[in-house]
Regions:
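Glycine-rich phosphate/pyrophosphate-binding loop and the adjoining helix
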Residues: 136-176
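Generic secondary-structure signature for well-ordered alpha-helical cores
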Residues: 121, 160-168, 210-216
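Helix-loop-strand module that forms the ligand-binding subsite of alpha/beta enzymes
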Residues: 51-133
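Active-site rim beta-loop-alpha module in soluble metabolic enzymes
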Residues: 172-186
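C-terminal segment of N-terminal export signals and the immediately downstream linker at the start
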Residues: 12-30, 39, 45
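N-terminal export signals
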Residues: 1-17
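Ferredoxin-like iron-sulfur electron-transfer modules
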Residues: 184-222
Length: 222
């Protein structure tokens, strides 16, 4: 048709059929340093920040697809993400979660699936995504950035799974379960809510205030 020729001439060679409905996807994220925001933006144009959303009185959401992206903290979801999944009511034909980590994931997918199920949310797809580890007390960032963890390749594979609405919960091995049990015995006390108040300020602090601006829990003042 003339309309089709005009579109082709203008460079718009592919158009979406008027009868084809675009799926509405909501993606919620929690990020401390930006890793999970980067991932969330790959799956939704305007992802929703859990620290901002959780202040709402009503946490009921409905869409064609709903996803949650968060960093694994000590094999667990951050406290605020745990609070969100306990309070929120997520209604969608397809629910997915992407858990990012830098070193070991251990029982993270299993623990998250159990927590969500106990609180009335059943995820169809839960996977992990290995990225740069930015837990500064344990890792040297200069060394971490040298490691090619192929984040974008992993994201592309996850994206294919979600587009196909794959039903899959990443399995946890017995070795990973044992690693988690040993970790909790050794350092479980540092994962309590009180650990959020632990802060070390050294003489090299320049008072820029970035920590105050980016902290999702508003733990810091300057």
């Amino acid at each position: 048709t003339l309309a089709g020729l005009a579109l082709t001439a203008s460079g718009l060679s592919s158009i979406t059929s008027c009868t084809e409905e675009k799926k509405r996807r909501l993606v919620f994220y929690f990020t401390g340093t930006g890793n999970c925001l980067y991932v969330a933006r790959k799956f939704a144009e305007n992802p929703l920040s859990i620290p901002q959303i959780i202040r709402q009185d009503k946490l009921e959401f409905e869409a064609d697809e709903i996803g949650i992206v968060y960093p694994i903290y000590g094999h667990l979801a951050p406290q605020m993400v745990q609070e969100f999944i306990r309070k929120a009511r997520l209604k969608a034909p397809y629910l997915f979660s992407i858990l990012t980590y830098g070193n070991r994931k251990c029982s993270a997918t299993e623990l998250w699936n159990n927590l969500a199920t106990e609180n009335g949310t059943r995820f169809d797809y839960i996977t992990t995504l290995k990225m740069v580890d930015n837990f500064l007390p344990s890792f040297d960032m200069n060394e971490q950035v040298k490691i090619d963890k192929q984040e974008d390749k992993q994201i592309a594979e996850i994206m294919q799974d979600i587009q196909a609405r794959k039903h899959w919960i990443q399995p946890v091995t017995e070795e990973e379960q044992q690693q988690h049990a040993e970790f909790m015995q050794r350092a479980g006390h540092t994962l309590s809510p009180s650990a959020e108040k632990l802060l070390v300020i050294k003489e090299n602090c320049i008072g820029c205030g970035i920590c105050v601006k980016v902290c999702p829990r508003r733990n810091y003042t300057l």
